[in-house]
UniProtKB/Swiss-Prot annotation:
Protein name in the entry: L-cysteine S-thiosulfotransferase subunit SoxA
GO biological process annotation, one example: sulfur oxidation
Signal sequence extent: 1-27
Family according to the record: Belongs to the SoxA family.
Binding residues annotated for substrate, in chain numbering: 243
Catalytically driven reaction(s): L-cysteinyl-[SoxY protein] + thiosulfate + 2 Fe(III)-[cytochrome c] = S-sulfosulfanyl-L-cysteinyl-[SoxY protein] + 2 Fe(II)-[cytochrome c] + 2 H(+); S-sulfanyl-L-cysteinyl-[SoxY protein] + thiosulfate + 2 Fe(III)-[cytochrome c] = S-(2-sulfodisulfanyl)-L-cysteinyl-[SoxY protein] + 2 Fe(II)-[cytochrome c] + 2 H(+)
PTM section of the record: Cysteine persulfide at Cys-247.
Cofactor binding annotation: Binds 1 heme group per subunit.
Summary of pH dependence: Optimum pH is 6.0-6.5.
Active site as annotated: 247 (cysteine persulfide intermediate)
Function as written in the Swiss-Prot or TrEMBL entry: C-type monoheme cytochrome, which is part of the SoxAX cytochrome complex involved in sulfur oxidation. The SoxAX complex catalyzes the formation of a heterodisulfide bond between the conserved cysteine residue on a sulfur carrier SoxYZ complex subunit SoxY and thiosulfate or other inorganic sulfur substrates. This leads to the liberation of two electrons, which may be transferred from the SoxAX complex to another cytochrome c and which then may be used for reductive CO(2) fixation.
Annotated organism of origin: Chlorobaculum tepidum (strain ATCC 49652 / DSM 12025 / NBRC 103806 / TLS) (Chlorobium tepidum)
Protein backbone atom coordinates (compact mmCIF):
# COMPACT_ATOMS: atom_id res chain seq x y z
CA UNK A 1 0.00 0.00 0.00
CA UNK A 2 2.80 2.39 0.94
CA UNK A 3 4.62 1.72 -2.33
CA UNK A 4 1.42 2.35 -4.32
CA UNK A 5 1.02 5.72 -2.61
CA UNK A 6 4.65 6.56 -3.35
CA UNK A 7 4.15 5.66 -7.00
CA UNK A 8 1.05 7.86 -7.12
CA UNK A 9 2.90 10.80 -5.64
CA UNK A 10 5.72 10.37 -8.13
CA UNK A 11 3.42 10.25 -11.14
CA UNK A 12 1.70 13.36 -9.87
CA UNK A 13 5.05 15.09 -9.71
CA UNK A 14 5.75 14.13 -13.33
CA UNK A 15 2.54 15.85 -14.41
CA UNK A 16 3.66 19.11 -12.84
CA UNK A 17 7.30 18.94 -13.89
CA UNK A 18 7.04 20.77 -17.20
CA UNK A 19 4.77 23.49 -15.88
CA UNK A 20 7.23 24.22 -13.08
CA UNK A 21 10.28 24.46 -15.35
CA UNK A 22 11.59 28.01 -15.26
CA UNK A 23 11.65 29.87 -18.57
CA UNK A 24 13.67 33.10 -18.78
CA UNK A 25 11.60 36.10 -19.85
CA UNK A 26 11.82 36.92 -23.56
CA UNK A 27 14.17 33.97 -24.11
CA UNK A 28 13.70 31.42 -26.85
CA UNK A 29 12.30 28.24 -25.33
CA UNK A 30 14.20 25.02 -25.89
CA UNK A 31 11.23 22.68 -26.17
CA UNK A 32 13.38 19.63 -26.79
CA UNK A 33 15.20 20.25 -23.50
CA UNK A 34 11.88 20.39 -21.64
CA UNK A 35 10.81 17.13 -23.22
CA UNK A 36 14.17 15.47 -22.55
CA UNK A 37 13.72 16.30 -18.86
CA UNK A 38 10.35 14.54 -18.93
CA UNK A 39 11.87 11.50 -20.63
CA UNK A 40 14.65 11.30 -18.06
CA UNK A 41 12.19 11.43 -15.16
CA UNK A 42 9.73 9.01 -16.79
CA UNK A 43 12.34 6.39 -17.62
CA UNK A 44 14.02 6.96 -14.27
CA UNK A 45 10.78 6.05 -12.52
CA UNK A 46 10.64 2.64 -14.20
CA UNK A 47 14.33 1.95 -13.81
CA UNK A 48 14.00 2.62 -10.09
CA UNK A 49 10.87 0.47 -9.75
CA UNK A 50 12.35 -2.39 -11.77
CA UNK A 51 16.13 -2.17 -11.25
CA UNK A 52 16.77 -5.65 -12.66
CA UNK A 53 15.17 -4.85 -16.02
CA UNK A 54 17.41 -3.48 -18.75
CA UNK A 55 16.11 -0.34 -20.45
CA UNK A 56 15.79 -2.01 -23.86
CA UNK A 57 13.73 -4.86 -22.36
CA UNK A 58 10.85 -2.54 -21.47
CA UNK A 59 9.79 -2.82 -25.10
CA UNK A 60 8.71 -6.38 -24.27
CA UNK A 61 5.99 -5.23 -21.87
CA UNK A 62 5.02 -7.59 -19.06
CA UNK A 63 7.43 -10.18 -20.44
CA UNK A 64 10.27 -8.02 -19.18
CA UNK A 65 8.88 -8.22 -15.64
CA UNK A 66 7.65 -11.78 -15.13
CA UNK A 67 9.90 -14.76 -15.86
CA UNK A 68 7.10 -17.33 -16.23
CA UNK A 69 5.19 -15.11 -18.65
CA UNK A 70 8.43 -14.45 -20.53
CA UNK A 71 9.05 -18.18 -21.06
CA UNK A 72 5.55 -18.69 -22.44
CA UNK A 73 5.94 -15.66 -24.71
CA UNK A 74 9.29 -16.87 -26.07
CA UNK A 75 7.75 -20.23 -26.90
CA UNK A 76 4.94 -18.45 -28.74
CA UNK A 77 7.43 -16.28 -30.64
CA UNK A 78 9.13 -19.39 -32.05
CA UNK A 79 6.09 -19.71 -34.32
CA UNK A 80 4.75 -16.13 -34.22
CA UNK A 81 1.00 -15.87 -34.82
CA UNK A 82 1.52 -12.69 -36.84
CA UNK A 83 3.82 -14.32 -39.41
CA UNK A 84 1.12 -14.72 -42.05
CA UNK A 85 0.01 -11.13 -41.47
CA UNK A 86 3.53 -9.89 -42.18
CA UNK A 87 3.59 -11.86 -45.43
CA UNK A 88 0.18 -10.48 -46.40
CA UNK A 89 1.35 -6.98 -45.50
CA UNK A 90 4.36 -7.33 -47.78
CA UNK A 91 2.13 -8.32 -50.68
CA UNK A 92 -0.19 -5.37 -50.03
CA UNK A 93 2.75 -2.99 -49.72
CA UNK A 94 4.02 -3.94 -53.17
CA UNK A 95 0.65 -4.46 -54.88
CA UNK A 96 0.19 -1.97 -57.75
CA UNK A 97 -2.58 0.59 -57.53
CA UNK A 98 -4.80 1.24 -60.53
CA UNK A 99 -2.40 4.04 -61.55
CA UNK A 100 0.60 1.69 -61.51
CA UNK A 101 2.11 3.01 -58.30
CA UNK A 102 2.00 1.26 -54.91
CA UNK A 103 2.50 1.87 -51.22
CA UNK A 104 6.17 1.21 -51.88
CA UNK A 105 6.17 4.36 -54.04
CA UNK A 106 5.32 6.51 -51.00
CA UNK A 107 7.93 5.31 -48.52
CA UNK A 108 11.74 5.54 -48.74
CA UNK A 109 14.28 2.96 -47.61
CA UNK A 110 12.30 0.08 -49.06
CA UNK A 111 9.58 0.69 -46.50
CA UNK A 112 11.81 0.33 -43.43
CA UNK A 113 10.46 3.58 -42.02
CA UNK A 114 8.99 2.67 -38.62
CA UNK A 115 11.59 4.84 -36.93
CA UNK A 116 10.26 7.92 -38.75
CA UNK A 117 6.83 7.74 -37.10
CA UNK A 118 5.08 9.33 -35.38
CA UNK A 119 6.33 12.81 -36.13
CA UNK A 120 4.94 16.32 -35.94
CA UNK A 121 4.32 17.85 -39.36
CA UNK A 122 5.23 21.53 -39.02
CA UNK A 123 3.31 22.56 -42.13
CA UNK A 124 0.10 20.74 -41.23
CA UNK A 125 0.49 21.43 -37.51
CA UNK A 126 -0.45 17.91 -36.49
CA UNK A 127 1.00 14.54 -35.53
CA UNK A 128 1.35 12.05 -38.39
CA UNK A 129 1.33 8.35 -37.53
CA UNK A 130 2.45 5.43 -39.66
CA UNK A 131 -1.09 4.19 -40.23
CA UNK A 132 -2.16 7.70 -41.18
CA UNK A 133 0.65 7.89 -43.76
CA UNK A 134 -0.33 4.50 -45.21
CA UNK A 135 -3.91 5.57 -45.82
CA UNK A 136 -2.91 9.00 -47.09
CA UNK A 137 -0.73 7.28 -49.69
CA UNK A 138 -3.67 5.18 -50.82
CA UNK A 139 -6.04 8.14 -51.06
CA UNK A 140 -3.47 10.28 -52.89
CA UNK A 141 -3.26 7.53 -55.51
CA UNK A 142 -6.99 7.18 -56.00
CA UNK A 143 -7.48 4.15 -53.74
CA UNK A 144 -9.90 3.72 -50.85
CA UNK A 145 -8.40 3.98 -47.35
CA UNK A 146 -8.14 0.89 -45.19
CA UNK A 147 -10.27 0.55 -42.06
CA UNK A 148 -8.20 1.93 -39.20
CA UNK A 149 -8.02 -0.64 -36.41
CA UNK A 150 -7.43 -4.06 -37.95
CA UNK A 151 -7.21 -5.98 -41.18
CA UNK A 152 -5.07 -4.68 -44.03
CA UNK A 153 -3.90 -1.51 -42.26
CA UNK A 154 -2.50 -3.65 -39.44
CA UNK A 155 -0.93 -6.10 -41.90
CA UNK A 156 0.89 -3.39 -43.84
CA UNK A 157 1.97 -1.75 -40.59
CA UNK A 158 3.22 -5.13 -39.34
CA UNK A 159 5.31 -5.63 -42.47
CA UNK A 160 6.85 -2.17 -42.17
CA UNK A 161 7.54 -2.79 -38.47
CA UNK A 162 9.14 -6.15 -39.21
CA UNK A 163 11.68 -4.73 -41.67
CA UNK A 164 12.36 -1.79 -39.33
CA UNK A 165 13.24 -3.82 -36.24
CA UNK A 166 16.20 -2.40 -34.39
CA UNK A 167 15.59 1.20 -35.43
CA UNK A 168 15.91 3.51 -32.46
CA UNK A 169 13.00 5.54 -31.13
CA UNK A 170 14.07 9.16 -31.49
CA UNK A 171 11.06 11.47 -31.71
CA UNK A 172 11.86 15.18 -31.78
CA UNK A 173 9.80 18.03 -30.33
CA UNK A 174 11.34 21.18 -31.76
CA UNK A 175 8.59 23.81 -32.01
CA UNK A 176 5.85 25.31 -29.87
CA UNK A 177 3.22 23.64 -32.05
CA UNK A 178 4.90 20.24 -31.62
CA UNK A 179 5.24 20.88 -27.90
CA UNK A 180 1.54 21.76 -27.65
CA UNK A 181 0.64 18.42 -29.28
CA UNK A 182 3.05 16.65 -26.93
CA UNK A 183 1.46 18.36 -23.92
CA UNK A 184 -2.03 17.37 -25.05
CA UNK A 185 -0.85 13.77 -25.22
CA UNK A 186 0.79 14.09 -21.82
CA UNK A 187 -2.37 15.49 -20.23
CA UNK A 188 -4.40 12.68 -21.78
CA UNK A 189 -2.01 10.10 -20.33
CA UNK A 190 -2.31 11.45 -16.78
CA UNK A 191 -6.00 12.49 -16.81
CA UNK A 192 -8.58 10.34 -15.06
CA UNK A 193 -11.69 9.44 -17.03
CA UNK A 194 -14.54 6.97 -17.33
CA UNK A 195 -16.79 5.30 -14.80
CA UNK A 196 -13.77 3.85 -12.99
CA UNK A 197 -12.07 7.28 -12.84
CA UNK A 198 -8.80 5.78 -14.08
CA UNK A 199 -5.91 7.18 -16.09
CA UNK A 200 -3.33 5.59 -18.37
CA UNK A 201 -0.70 6.39 -15.74
CA UNK A 202 -2.87 4.97 -12.96
CA UNK A 203 -2.71 1.52 -14.54
CA UNK A 204 0.62 1.51 -16.32
CA UNK A 205 2.76 3.43 -13.82
CA UNK A 206 1.23 3.10 -10.36
CA UNK A 207 0.19 -0.53 -10.88
CA UNK A 208 2.79 -1.64 -13.41
CA UNK A 209 3.97 -5.18 -12.71
CA UNK A 210 1.03 -6.00 -10.46
CA UNK A 211 -1.85 -8.36 -11.04
CA UNK A 212 -5.29 -7.17 -12.08
CA UNK A 213 -7.55 -10.20 -12.02
CA UNK A 214 -5.42 -12.80 -13.82
CA UNK A 215 -3.30 -10.37 -15.82
CA UNK A 216 -0.08 -8.50 -15.06
CA UNK A 217 -0.24 -4.78 -15.79
CA UNK A 218 2.34 -3.74 -18.38
CA UNK A 219 4.69 -0.79 -17.81
CA UNK A 220 3.98 2.33 -19.87
CA UNK A 221 7.63 2.56 -20.89
CA UNK A 222 7.98 0.82 -24.26
CA UNK A 223 4.25 0.64 -24.93
CA UNK A 224 4.44 1.90 -28.51
CA UNK A 225 7.59 0.11 -29.69
CA UNK A 226 6.05 -3.25 -30.53
CA UNK A 227 2.81 -2.43 -32.35
CA UNK A 228 0.90 -3.65 -34.22
CA UNK A 229 0.29 -6.72 -32.08
CA UNK A 230 -1.42 -10.06 -32.50
CA UNK A 231 -3.54 -10.42 -29.35
CA UNK A 232 -4.85 -13.81 -28.35
CA UNK A 233 -7.94 -12.03 -27.05
CA UNK A 234 -8.60 -10.59 -30.51
CA UNK A 235 -7.53 -13.66 -32.43
CA UNK A 236 -5.96 -11.34 -34.98
CA UNK A 237 -3.52 -8.49 -35.43
CA UNK A 238 -4.53 -4.95 -34.52
CA UNK A 239 -3.20 -1.41 -34.26
CA UNK A 240 -2.18 0.70 -31.29
CA UNK A 241 -5.32 2.82 -31.59
CA UNK A 242 -7.46 -0.30 -31.38
CA UNK A 243 -5.73 -1.01 -28.08
CA UNK A 244 -6.34 2.57 -26.93
CA UNK A 245 -10.05 2.12 -27.63
CA UNK A 246 -10.04 -1.15 -25.70
CA UNK A 247 -8.45 0.52 -22.69
CA UNK A 248 -11.08 3.26 -22.82
CA UNK A 249 -13.84 0.66 -22.84
CA UNK A 250 -12.25 -1.18 -19.92
CA UNK A 251 -12.54 1.86 -17.66
CA UNK A 252 -16.01 2.84 -18.84
CA UNK A 253 -14.91 5.78 -20.98
CA UNK A 254 -16.17 6.51 -24.48
CA UNK A 255 -13.33 5.80 -26.92
CA UNK A 256 -12.16 8.43 -29.34
CA UNK A 257 -12.13 7.60 -33.03
CA UNK A 258 -9.00 5.78 -34.26
CA UNK A 259 -6.48 8.29 -35.61
CA UNK A 260 -8.33 11.11 -33.85
CA UNK A 261 -6.21 14.04 -32.74
CA UNK A 262 -6.53 12.81 -29.15
CA UNK A 263 -5.12 9.36 -29.85
CA UNK A 264 -2.42 10.65 -32.21
CA UNK A 265 -1.23 13.11 -29.59
CA UNK A 266 -1.25 10.33 -26.98
CA UNK A 267 0.81 8.13 -29.30
CA UNK A 268 3.20 11.04 -29.84
CA UNK A 269 3.71 11.53 -26.10
CA UNK A 270 4.06 7.84 -25.34
CA UNK A 271 6.56 7.32 -28.13
CA UNK A 272 8.63 10.28 -26.96
CA UNK A 273 8.74 8.69 -23.51
CA UNK A 274 10.33 5.62 -25.14
CA UNK A 275 13.11 7.59 -26.83
CA UNK A 276 16.29 5.51 -26.79
CA UNK A 277 14.51 2.15 -26.98
CA UNK A 278 14.33 0.18 -30.22
CA UNK A 279 11.33 -0.66 -32.36
CA UNK A 280 10.59 -4.37 -32.01
CA UNK A 281 7.24 -4.94 -33.66
CA UNK A 282 5.15 -6.67 -34.60
CA UNK A 283 4.62 -8.67 -31.43
CA UNK A 284 2.28 -11.15 -29.79
CA UNK A 285 0.33 -10.48 -26.63
CA UNK A 286 -2.42 -12.21 -24.65
Amino acid sequence: MKKTIQRGLFTGALVLMTAMTAKPANAEVNYQALVDADVKAFQGFFRKEFPDVKLEDFGNGVYALDEDARKQWKEMEEFPPYELDVEAGKALFNKPFANGKSLASCFPNGGAVRGMYPYFDEKRKEVVTLEMAINECRVANGEKPYAWEKGDIARVSAYIASISRGQKVDVKVKSKAAYDAYMKGKKFFYAKRGQLNMSCSGCHMEYAGRHLRAEIISPALGHTTHFPVFRSKWGEIGTLHRRYAGCSNNIGAKPFAPQSEEYRDLEFFQTVMSNGLKYNGPASRK
